[in-house]
Amino acid sequence: EGTAAGKKDVRYPLSRSFYLVWNGKLNSVEEEFLRYIRSAGQEIVGQSYVTVSKQNSFLSLKPKGKITITGSTSVGPLLECLAEEYMKQNPKASIKVTQTDSGNGINQTIQGKCDMGMSSRELRDPEKELLNYEVIARDEIAVIVNAANPLNDITMDQLEAIYTGKTTEWKAIYR
């Protein structure tokens, strides 16, 4: 059983983190956009996802600049909403979100082809060494099975084993 959207509960076992990654020091617009996501933006996060920080008030200092963000199609719609709402508070900012995939967003950020990347997968150790990153939301995953299936609970590792073909029968899980 999952938690209601907007509830901060990182104990839910079938969830994944939504990451925002960047390379090096943030400029003033990037810094403020990240501050917005951490504070007032969590209200938007909470409409469909699990929040990761307290929903505090936000006051824009209205820095001027552009941000290009590339990556995950899972994170993209959330980032588009966050960018749209942030730009209402700071009309001097321009944020372009391009949805590709997590790996592309991470690689484009490492290569300096975009300012920030979006990822819905865990970062690998070399990526963690090269980039700064922050979890901006958590996405709960629901698994739907036949009502006759006796399984009441499953871990991410067990679910991965099913999807990668390492486990091919349900009975291997509920032994």
Language model: regions and residue ranges:
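Exported/periplasmic ABC-transporter solute-binding proteins
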Residues: 1-175
